[in-house]
From Swiss-Prot:
Domain of life: Eukaryota
Name of the gene: SIDA2
Entries under Gene3D superfamilies matching the protein: FAD/NAD(P)-binding domain (3.50.50.60)
Catalytic activity: L-ornithine + NADPH + O2 = N(5)-hydroxy-L-ornithine + NADP(+) + H2O; L-ornithine + NADH + O2 = N(5)-hydroxy-L-ornithine + NAD(+) + H2O
Name the UniProt record assigns to this protein: L-ornithine N(5)-monooxygenase
Pfam family, one: Lys_Orn_oxgnase
Chain positions recorded as NADP(+) binding sites: N270, G271, Q272, S273, N339, Y340, G341
């Protein structure tokens, strides 16, 4: 770290007392709680001054970290009997912090389109599958919002996506005291003790509100930073008219302000997000020409049948992790048809119906189809992206069209090249989940085989990172969330297992009694030297 980096502690004046009472009623006496607003809903977790050693710091405060916070709350209030024996939670409330780069809690806010539904049952919320008695169930949220009866009248397990985000915001509001927003973590650095063993980690973050770099120390660090938008080559990553699907709701309002204008728009991708964007554009920009470019021959339905859904059972995580690596890789490829590059059947049928109506209005022949305002173009690959000489400020897509190889009614179909000039292109090509590799760069010397090019961090079944033997103390470590699909299965990046996994994480993180910096735990009182 540069010696000129501005450090901001953000902690209250005055040191903590030498002796603190042990855990009693979820409060610590050395914290002035008058600095926090009175909250209608408040978790059992309390603010820890920034300069104190934390038991846990979570990098990111999305659904994965939220599930950990919910499980901690349930463990402390006694409603979750499965966590009643966690030793590290017996003497005092844990000292935790969640660092989130966004200014407030948000979940896929850029894809909260009108009418969009969840793709999993509301019962797979932040708590129900682990602790149905929790205050954080979706049903309790509905009860608190006075909508339980009306929701029951909908006769559905699939709430609107906008309502489910509001549910998660409601859950997140309980933890305002321990969440620092606008904090973008930039590195996690190991710290050695006098014995040479790593006993804590320094979490460095950039405060977007102050512009300063801040530092916090923790024994346990959970990296749950989520995915970053994947804009693959040849698309430029910083062009104002090349927009990732995660920003669609925001950017479409800026780029496509006139709903009656004759825009030229392209959507790239063959999954749920691409289909939703294509359908939204068709419905809201009727005078535009919209093209959905897919690499295969057709949009394919997701498989959410009961037997296939067992892939996402929490117990399947054990099965997946314990498989031989080659078998695990094979089954992951088989399972991806349930979630990757597929679309819910109801939306597929709706899109097909809207395209069919164009056959009635504009004609059914191939020549007439070429002039439809909204089309799906199969077997297309974008080979290059340049500035458009036709659409002001837009881009030209240089496309390889392989459809003749598959759809030609005569032998000898040939690939051809085509160009599409568009005012905007929306790229629905998923996410990359590799931020932990960057954050842990200063710990790479602790990675087994870390000197080898291309070596990746490996985790145990409880998501704990494998470090070189005896390099990191038993009471310290790093855990990964949402980037372990190759070892823990397809559900790793999904909502399906969050409630159960949150409980597993609490047990793994706090199984042992917490200690102060000197390592002492003394009866009902914890002593610092």
């Amino acid at each position: 770290m540069s010696p000129h980096v501005d450090m901001s502690s953000g902690s209250p004046d005055g040191a903590a007392p030498a002796v603190q009472k042990a855990f009693n009623g979820f409060l610590t006496e050395n914290i002035d709680e008058s600095q926090f607003p009175a909250l209608e809903n408040r978790s059992h977790l309390r603010y820890t001054p920034q300069d104190e050693l934390h038991d846990m710091i979570c990098v990111g405060f999305g659904p994965a970290s939220l599930a950990i916070g919910v499980a901690l709350h349930d463990a402390l209030d006694g409603t979750d009997g499965s966590l009643a024996d966690v030793q590290g939670l017996q003497s005092r409330p844990p000292k935790v912090a969640f660092l989130e780069k966004q200014p407030q809690f948000a979940w896929h806010a850029g894809m909260l389109l009108p009418g969009a539904k969840m793709q999993i049952t509301f019962m797979k919320d932040m708590a129900t599958m682990r602790n149905p008695r929790s205050e954080f169930t979706f049903l309790n949220y509905l009860h608190q919002k006075d909508r339980l009866v009306e929701f029951a009248n909908l006769n559905t397990f699939l709430p609107a996506r906008v309502e489910y985000e509001d549910y998660m915001k409601w859950c997140a509001s309980w933890f305002e005291e321990v969440v620092a927003y606008s904090q973008e973590v930039v590195k996690v650095m190991p710290e050695k003790s006098a014995s040479g063993e790593i006993t804590s980690f320094n979490v460095m973050s950039h405060n977007h509100l102050t512009g300063r770099t801040e530092s916090r120390r923790a024994k346990h660090v959970v990296i749950a930073a989520g995915g970053r938008p994947n804009i693959p080559a040849p698309f430029p990553t910083n062009h104002p008219r090349v927009i990732h699907s995660s920003q669609f709701s925001y950017m479409s309002k800026q780029l496509l302000k006139d709903h009656d204008a004759p825009y030229n728009i392209a959507v790239v991708g063959n999954g749920q997000s691409a289909a939703e964007i294509f359908d939204f554009l068709h419905a809201n920009y009727p005078n535009s020409r919209t093209r959905l470019l897919i690499k295969g021959g057709a949009l394919r339905p997701s498989d959410d049948s009961p037997f296939v859904n067992e892939i996402f059972n929490p117990s399947r995580t054990d099965c997946t992790y314990n498989r031989a690596p080659k078998l695990r890789a094979t089954t992951l490829v088989e399972d991806k048809g349930t979630n990757y590059g597929v679309v819910r059947l109801g939306l597929l049928e709706h899109i097909y119906e809207t395209l069919y109506m164009q056959r009635i209005r504009y004609g059914n022949s191939p020549a007439e189809e070429a002039h439809w305002p909204h089309r799906i173009l199969p077997y297309r690959r974008v080979m290059d992206v340049t500035e458009s000489p036709v659409c002001q400020g837009g881009v030209r897509l240089h496309v390889q069209d392989s459809s003749a190889l598959y759809f030609s009614e005569q032998a000898g179909g040939q690939e051809r090249k085509e160009t599409l000039d568009v005012d905007a292109v929306f790229v629905a090509t998923g996410y990359l989940r590799d931020l932990h590799e960057t954050l842990l760069k200063d710990a790479r010397h602790l990675m087994p085989g870390g000197e080898l090019e291309g070596a990746k961090w490996q985790v145990q079944r409880d998501y704990r990172v494998n470090f070189t033997e005896k390099s990191v103390g038993e009471d310290a470590g790093v855990w990964l969330q949402g980037c372990c699909e190759s070892t823990h299965g397809l559900s790793d990046t999904l909502l399906s297992v969050l409630a159960t996994r949150g409980g597993e994480m609490v047990r793994s993180l706090f199984e042992k009694p917490a200690k102060w910096d000197n390592g002492h735990v003394l009866g009902g009182y914890e002593v610092r030297e």
